[in-house]
């Protein structure tokens, strides 16, 4: 799968109409609520426009107040009551609309979060290796929040403003075509201003969203690596780097806010000028009976027209900010899922596993893994493995040693197909691993990593993560194999003790013991122990070793370790250097060769 660079999605919104339409399509999940909301908008707009129209007959009544005072008084009362009723209807429909849109946005946000999380889950490991956790989390936080604000308020207010604007134009045409012609000319000026401010807003808000993600990513990285920062006393340098990106974010936010704050005053001043021009032209052009009512009514609509145009402009600014977040969310959703063209599946019958071939034939899973002339690189033209060949017979323990970057962990990444090779082949019981479905392949592999990740939940739940259908007794037996039962039993609630924040309430060695128990309960025929005992003391390592010996019985095992004691009893030890196997053999054979492995043993050089 090609490298995924999310930076290309941090540009300005390229097609806001398409993004908005795609977002609007999510209203299909709440059609009834949307229908009720649209009816509420129509009722609200009709009430506000009707209330403005009442100014015309009220003005005419004031002009004719000298004749038939009783009749005029009765009309006053009826108009005032009607006006009060319209204002009440406006308030009620506005409240109802807000409630309906809150429910709609909650439903749509649930759907968006589900789709976003599902897309993330279907991405390959390469995707997470190449993108910072903080930057990815910003999609779930700032971008989701911006989109939620768009759905709750921006779209609603924009719909109200546009509907009200159209209704206002209709009433203005009905009152005076000549005055409306003046408004068309003045409106063209407003449209020009709106287009200019909208274009600026798109750039500033996209930049703000991009820098927000950068700050989140940097903070997450520094908080996670705080121990290393303090060990090397780089607090000052970290703070200086943070100040740089934080200053950029502050500058972008200030620019975006400045643009927004300028729009309102500019349009308000324009509306005052247009109001005065319309009033002056109306006095000169309108004559005859009822002219005063027409002018007052028209001016009321001019005010409404100007307000709606101003609101639309401001709402477009908010819309652009929200659309920048929505576009980033959709960019993630549009990423292709991890490719898997495998057709060979894994079948289990008790403790026995078999591969089911496409033709229906069964191949017993024995744990025979072979690499043949494998080449691989994470980045083009920078090879990590070169013409690598090795094999692990069923039940053998294969150990990898070598300096950092030699390719040890890469080999295990290729076995479980976190990455795919560029040339050569990897076979599993004679089957090319690319023919095996990835989930079935990984189900046949148990892994224990040095950087153990534990989920929020009880100790029992974390062990059961290795095989969700495992019983409590099976989890306890696995913990005993990993020599974790003793310390777990002495926790405050034993196996029901809740672990927080990646197992922060356990020591590093205890976390690794839980991870080994998780691998034990999985019953995987092949085990990958990536520096599995490098984070525990010698005594604990010895106890784990005893448990692992029982765990590894009858299984094919790949081991990467810091310490020579971890690999002494391996059937074969592979010494890697710059992506090549430079020595291979068991512990005794390699010592007799007096090569790199011999130097590691006698000079006590670290293996990794």
Please describe what each predicted stretch is.
Residues 29, 125-126, 144-151, 155, ...:
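An intracellular "coupling" helix at the cytosolic face of ABC transporter transmembrane type-1 domains
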Residues 64-69, 85, 171-185, 255-328, ...:
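Helix-loop-helix
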Residues 120, 242, 329, 371-373:
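Conserved catalytic Walker-motif region of ABC-type ATPase nucleotide-binding domains
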Residues 29-43, 86, 153-207, 277-292, ...:
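Transmembrane helices of ABC transporter permease
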Residues 93, 97, 105, 141-186, ...:
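Hydrophobic alpha-helical transmembrane segments of ABC transporter permease domains
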Residues 1-48, 63-80, 97-101, 105, ...:
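Membrane-integrated ABC transporters
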Residues 350-608:
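ABC-type nucleotide-binding domain
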Residues 9-12, 16, 39, 47-63, ...:
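Juxtamembrane helix-loop junctions of ABC transporter transmembrane domains
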């Amino acid at each position: 799968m090609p490298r995924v660079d999310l930076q290309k999605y941090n540009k300005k919104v390229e097609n806001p109409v398409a993004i908005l339409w795609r977002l609007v399509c999510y209203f299909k999940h709440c059609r009834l609520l949307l229908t009720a909301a649209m009816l509420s908008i129509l009722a609200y707009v009709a009430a506000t426009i009707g209330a403005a129209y009442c100014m015309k007959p009220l003005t005419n009544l004031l002009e004719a107040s000298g004749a038939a005072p009783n009749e005029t008084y009765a009309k006053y009362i009826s108009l005032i009551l009607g006006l009060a009723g319209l204002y009440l209807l406006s308030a009620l429909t506005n409240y109802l609309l807000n409630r309906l849109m809150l429910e709609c946005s909650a439903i749509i946000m649930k759907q968006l979060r589900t789709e976003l999380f599902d897309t993330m889950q279907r991405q390959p490991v390469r995707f997470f290796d190449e993108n910072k956790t903080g930057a990815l989390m910003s999609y779930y936080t700032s971008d989701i929040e911006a989109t939620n604000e768009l759905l709750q308020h921006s779209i609603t207010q924009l719909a109200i403003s546009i509907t009200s604007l159209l209704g206002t134009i209709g009433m203005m045409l009905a009152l005076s075509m000549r005055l409306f012609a003046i408004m068309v000319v003045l409106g063209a000026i407003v449209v020009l201003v709106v287009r200019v401010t909208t274009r600026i807003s798109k750039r500033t808000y996209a930049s703000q969203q991009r820098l927000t993600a950068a700050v989140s990513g940097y903070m997450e990285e520094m908080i996670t690596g705080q121990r290393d920062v303090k060990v090397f006393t780089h607090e000052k340098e970290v703070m200086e780097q943070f100040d740089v990106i934080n200053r950029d974010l502050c500058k972008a936010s200030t620019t975006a806010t400045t643009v927004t704050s300028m729009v309102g005053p500019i349009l308000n001043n324009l509306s005052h000028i247009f109001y005065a021009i319309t009033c002056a032209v109306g006095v000169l052009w309108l004559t005859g009976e009822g002219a005063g009512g027409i002018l007052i009514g028209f001016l009321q609509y001019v005010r409404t027209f100007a307000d709606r145009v101003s609101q639309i402009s401001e709402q477009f600014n908010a819309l652009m900010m929200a659309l920048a977040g929505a576009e980033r969310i959709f960019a993630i959703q549009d990423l292709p899922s991890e490719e898997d063209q495998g057709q060979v599946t894994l079948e289990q019958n008790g403790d026995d596993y078999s591969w089911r071939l496409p033709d229906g034939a069964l191949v017993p899973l024995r744990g025979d893994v072979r690499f043949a002339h494998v080449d691989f690189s994470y980045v083009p033209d920078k090879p990590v493995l070169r013409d690598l060949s090795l094999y692990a017979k069923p039940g053998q323990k294969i150990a990898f040693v070598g300096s950092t970057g030699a390719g040890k962990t890469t080999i295990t990444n290729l076995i479980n197909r976190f990455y795919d090779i560029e040339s050569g082949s990897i076979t599993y019981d004679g089957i090319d691993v690319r023919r095996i479905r990835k989930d079935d392949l990984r189900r046949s592999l148990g892994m224990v990593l040095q950087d153990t990740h534990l989920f929020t939940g009880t100790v029992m739940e974390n062990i059961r993560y290795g095989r969700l259908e495992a019983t409590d007794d099976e989890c306890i037996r696995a913990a005993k194999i990993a020599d974790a039962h003793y310390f777990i039993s002495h926790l405050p609630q034993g196996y029901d003790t809740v672990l927080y924040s990646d197992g922060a309430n356990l020591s590093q060695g205890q976390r690794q013991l839980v991870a080994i128990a998780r691998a034990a309960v999985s019953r995987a025929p092949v085990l990958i122990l990536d520096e599995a005992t490098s984070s525990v003391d010698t005594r604990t390592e010895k106890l784990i070793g005893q448990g692992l010996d029982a765990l590894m019985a009858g299984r094919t095992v790949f081991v990467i370790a810091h310490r020579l004691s971890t690999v002494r009893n391996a059937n074969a030890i592979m010494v890697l250097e710059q992506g090549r196997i430079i020595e291979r053999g068991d512990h005794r054979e390699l010592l007799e060769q007096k090569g790199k492995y011999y130097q590691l043993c006698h000079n006590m050089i670290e293996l990794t």
